[in-house]
From Swiss-Prot:
Protein role: May play a role in DNA repair. It seems to be involved in an RecBC-independent recombinational process of DNA repair. It may act with RecF and RecO.
GO biological process terms, semicolon-separated: DNA recombination; DNA repair
Presence of keyword Ribosomal protein: no
Family under the similarity heading: Belongs to the RecR family.
Domain Toprim: 79-195
PANTHER family in the record: RECOMBINATION PROTEIN RECR
Positions of C4-type zinc fingers: 56-71
GO MF annotations in UniProt: DNA binding; zinc ion binding
UniProt cross-references to PROSITE patterns, sorted A to Z: RECR, TOPRIM
Alphabetical UniProt keywords: DNA damage, DNA recombination, DNA repair, Metal-binding, Zinc, Zinc-finger
InterPro entries per the UniProt record, alphabetical: DNA_Rcmb_RecR (IPR000093), Hlx-hairpin-Hlx_DNA-bd_motif (IPR003583), Rcmb_RecR (IPR023627), Rcmb_RecR_Znf (IPR015967), TOPRIM_dom (IPR006171), TOPRIM_RecR (IPR034137)
Protein name: Recombination protein RecR
The organism of origin for this protein: Corynebacterium glutamicum (strain ATCC 13032 / DSM 20300 / JCM 1318 / BCRC 11384 / CCUG 27702 / LMG 3730 / NBRC 12168 / NCIMB 10025 / NRRL B-2784 / 534)
Keyword Nucleotide-binding: no
Length: 218
């Protein structure tokens, strides 16, 4: 154990995903030896993320504006919505060049052990985008007033691109049942070939591209 600000920094770095105590210690000692201007830029970048990033009011992706660049792009196919767990998953799919529709970010996956149920995810706003009504009364009661917006009547297909793990599959199954209430809506899931038990962000572009193009209707 170190003392004072150094140990405080190590403790805070250790709280970051994927950063253990040893990695946090290496990063902290690296920061002790960098130019002060590098520290200043890091502080400014952290402040910029906190103050300059918000969530798109339509798809819940991270954005600098009220509506993100993808939702604002008239060239995107508004009739197809790809549902993902986190904003980082959008970047993975975009790199394939296979998808030209729009997205919806759930903000996680169903996980009863972590007390994450439907009300903790951005499910109600997805249902509103599709049909403007909420078939689940519990979800309707949990929707903040400032989240309401008109439905997109041209939505033809919803692609469930949650992670191929236990939580992701449970979330896709739950959403599939909810979306069955919307007539004429095609509901699809990424095709087989995705590694079971993994996260979307670690799937290579070729595999993901094939999974998108070969998606299966459910």
């Amino acid at each position: 154990m170190f003392e004072g600000p150094l140990q405080d920094l190590i403790d805070e770095l250790s709280r970051l995903p994927g950063v253990g105590p040893k990695s946090a210690q290496r990063i902290a000692f690296h920061l002790l030896n960098v130019d002060p201007s590098d520290i200043t830029r890091l502080q400014e970048a952290l402040g910029g993320v906190r103050d300059g990033v918000q969530f798109c009011r339509i798809c819940c992706n991270i954005s600098r504006e009220e509506v993100c660049r993808i939702c604002s792009d008239s060239g995107r196919d508004g009739g197809t919505i790809c549902v993902v767990e986190e904003p980082k998953d959008i970047q993975v799919i975009e790199r394939t060049g296979e998808f030209s529709g729009r997205y919806h970010v759930l903000g996680g996956a169903l996980d009863p052990l972590a007390n994450i149920g439907p009300r903790e995810l951005n499910i109600s706003t997805l249902l509103q985008r599709i049909g403007g009504v909420l078939p689940d009364r519990e979800l309707a009661d949990s929707t903040p007033e400032n989240k309401l917006f008109d439905a997109t009547p041209t939505v033809r297909e919803v692609i469930l691109a949650t992670d191929p793990n236990t939580e992701g599959e449970a979330t896709a199954s739950y959403l599939g049942r909810l979306l069955k209430d919307f007539p004429d809506l095609v509901i699809s899931r990424l095709a087989s070939g995705m590694p079971l038990g993994g996260d979307l962000e670690f799937v290579d572009e070729l595999t993901l591209s094939r999974a998108l193009s070969g998606r299966l209707q459910i």
